[in-house]
Amino acid sequence: MNGNQIKQLKKLYRHILNEASKFENINYNVYFSNKAKEKFREFCSDTNFESEKLKTFQNECWDYLNMLKRQTIIHNLYHVDKPLVNK
């Protein structure tokens, strides 16, 4: 894995975390952030970086990012805050 690929993965990781932080509900925010962190830790813990494995991981991450973008839009469109004070 060369330096350019590492930079691309870090950039993709930051995009995923940024998109996950856009959820208005903190529970979704934390869940998707933790899921992304876990995926990247699992991938980086493997010391054998094959180009084919890296490509499939990048494709999975792009799919995950696109899914997050769609879900944040939908969630925030229909998000309803609960009243803080009950009558």
Swiss-Prot record:
One of its GO terms (molecular function) is cysteine desulfurase activity. GO terms for cellular component: L-cysteine desulfurase complex; mitochondrion. One of its GO terms (biological process) is iron-sulfur cluster assembly. Keywords: Mitochondrion, Transferase. Pathway: Cofactor biosynthesis; iron-sulfur cluster biosynthesis. Pfam families: Complex1_LYR. Signal peptide: none annotated. Transmembrane segments: none annotated. It is found in: Mitochondrion. InterPro entries: Complex1_LYR_dom, Complex1_LYR_LYRM4, ISC_assembly_LYR. Participates in iron-sulfur cluster formation (ISC) pathway for iron-sulfur (Fe-S) cluster biogenesis. Enhances cysteine desulfurase activity of IscS. Interacts with IscS; the interaction enhances cysteine desulfurase activity of IscS. Component of a complex, at least composed of IscS, Isd11 and IscU. Belongs to the complex I LYR family. PANTHER family: LYR MOTIF-CONTAINING PROTEIN 4 (PTHR13166:SF7), PROTEIN C6ORF149 (PTHR13166). This is Protein Isd11. It comes from Plasmodium falciparum (isolate 3D7).
